[in-house]
A protein has these predicted regions:
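Phenylalanine-focused residue identity feature
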Residues: 7, 25, 45-47, 57, ...
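Flanking helices and flexible, charged tails adjoining ferredoxin-like Fe-S electron-transfer domains
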Residues: 11, 15, 20-23, 35, ...
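Non-catalytic, usually N-terminal nucleic-acid engagement modules in DNA/RNA processing proteins
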Residues: 2-272, 279-280
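Context-gated lysine
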Residues: 39, 106, 132, 138, ...
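Catalytic cores of enzyme domains
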Residues: 224-447
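Glutamate identity and glutamate-enriched acidic tracts
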Residues: 28, 32-34, 109, 142, ...
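Compositionally biased, intrinsically disordered low-complexity regions
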Residues: 54, 94-97, 154-157, 243, ...
Length: 496
């Protein structure tokens, strides 16, 4: 074959490879109901088809096209050069501390929005005590409490469509039932009669073996990600604030130091459900995952008890610990701009739970997904947030000794009450939330290894997918009456 023939073959093969890659991108984008990406991908696909025809039938165009494709490949090659500066997440959640930790202040559970909304009730001693200490919260809390519980009037954005609201309500019944079984002592439940309760009855397992069993058991039960960490006492709440079962004597008590190890799990929220945000299918998916997490962690906790060890399940009806820093320490992900976990494989599209235990286990190492640098330039969650609760600034601020982008919990929680769902728009619009499929796997692979990609990819993502959020069509079995658009619920009205 002549040199010109070899040149023609190489040029054609390179362009064909690009065409196939773009074709896969278009296919995945259509499958994901993306409104903009298939159009952009289709235009690029057509452009390279034209290039292919020019390569075959116009010899004079081959050299300029070769230069063009060479430049394209060279730019792509730059993203494959492994170079990162090392994210703070590699030091675990402690990497986000602003200083040496001397100015760190533990989170008080009494201050979280859920506790202020449903566990500080007018006319109670807790009400008088809390607002004597925090009078700055009183006016907002009373206005928000008048709107209802955490979700206000559930499902109001979708005309309170009863089948969907009933799915949400029924999902939360399981955590309600399991909350009382969260704390487990050795020999608890049915294991008591078989193994007894004495210290000598602890099962003697090598930590490596125990770790393998625990991780496999958790995944068999339904966890999508599992990690283990030493439990850092800084990530425990300082005082009890959430009361679910009438034990009001516990309100305001100091939360004891946690057990030495934590098994942290994440469950994936189905992409198609999340992408309907802020409509009811997204909160149905949240409720389902909270039920799933309660189920998994309760079984794990009682497994530890049956093995002769103490354990505490951390789920929607019993939290001693903050889940996000725990998950970072356990190697499940990083802290994102929206204030919660960007998980491996699934991005923010997860719910996180844990089990404390004193069984010796082997901790995992924190990971670097490239999310922190990516979030600096991306800002999609902040720009799409209906209540403007996520900061747009590139730089982080220090809060309780932690350097991070600080979510405005009050405006966020107000929006929940307005639409009757937990919103999920920031979760849905995040580029890391895209399904764990071929194209997105490749992007994640590059982001983990390339500092340049972390800076440039947010702009490429905006070009391909657009910057603003639009809810996707819900699955047919979750169709709700039309007439209420998410746009009608944007803004922070009612806060003034």
């Amino acid at each position: 074959m002549s040199d010109s023939g070899i040149f023609l073959v190489i040029l054609s093969v390179v362009n064909l490879a690009i065409v196939l890659g773009i074709g896969l991108f278009v296919y995945e984008s259509v499958r994901e109901q993306e409104p903009r990406a298939p159009k952009v991908g289709g235009a690029l696909f057509g452009f390279h088809i034209v290039l292919g025809l020019l390569i075959l039938f116009w010899p004079g165009a081959r050299l300029p096209i070769a230069w063009f494709l060479g430049i394209v490949l060279a730019i792509q090659g730059l993203f494959l050069i492994p170079w990162t500066r090392g994210a703070r997440s590699l030091n675990g959640a402690a990497g986000y501390l602003a200083t040496d930790g001397s100015d760190f202040v533990k989170m008080d559970e009494r201050d979280i929005m859920f506790a202020r909304n449903r566990s500080i009730l007018p006319g109670t001693p807790q009400y008088e005590q809390y607002y004597k200490i925090h009078p700055e919260h009183k006016d907002y809390d009373e206005r928000r409490r008048a709107r209802g519980g955490p979700l206000g009037k559930p499902g109001v954005i979708d005309s309170c469509y009863r089948p969907n609201v009933a799915m949400l309500v029924s999902s939360f019944e399981l955590p309600n039932l399991l909350g009382k079984a969260s704390r487990v002592d050795p020999g608890a439940s049915a294991a008591r009669s078989t193994y007894g309760t004495k210290e000598a009855n602890k099962a003697q397992l090598d930590p490596d073996k125990a770790t393998k069993i625990v991780k496999a058991w958790a995944k068999h039960l339904g966890a999508d990600l599992v990690g283990i960490c030493r439990t850092d006492r800084r990530w425990a709440y300082s005082h009890r604030g959430e009361i679910h079962y009438g034990e009001w004597e516990e309100w305001g008590k100091e939360i004891p130091d946690p057990l030495p190890y934590s098994v942290v799990i994440a469950t994936e929220m189905t992409h198609d459900m999340v992408m309907t945000a802020p409509h009811t299918p997204s909160v149905i998916e949240s409720g389902y995952n909270y039920a799933k997490g309660a189920y998994i962690t309760t079984i794990l906790a009682h497994w530890f008890g049956a093995m002769g060890y103490r354990a505490v399940a951390e789920h929607n009806r019993h939290y001693d610990l903050l889940m996000v820093p725990l998950a970072i320490d356990a190697g499940l992900g990083e802290l994102g701009r929206q204030g919660y976990l960007i998980a491996d494989k699934f991005g923010p599209r997860v719910r996180v739970f844990a089990v404390q235990t004193d069984m010796p286990l082997v901790p995992d190492k924190p990971i670097d997904l490239g999310a922190e640098k990516f979030c600096e330039s991306c800002k999609k969650c902040a720009e799409s947030c209906p209540s403007k609760s996520i900061p747009l600034e590139r730089q982080r601020k220090v809060d309780r000794g932690i350097e991070r982008w600080k979510l405005n919990e009050e405006t966020c929680f107000e929006y929940w009450g307005k639409v009757g769902t937990d919103c999920c728009v920031c979760m849905a619009v995040c580029p890391f939330s895209r399904p764990y499929r071929t194209i997105h796997k490749l992007v994640r692979y590059i982001l983990r290894r390339s500092e340049l990609a972390r800076i440039v990819f947010p702009y490429i993502d905006n070009f391909l997918y657009g910057k603003r959020w639009r809810p996707r069509k819900e699955p047919q079995w979750l169709e709700y009456p039309r007439g209420t658009k998410s746009e009608n619920f944007h803004g922070s009205e009612g806060l003034s």
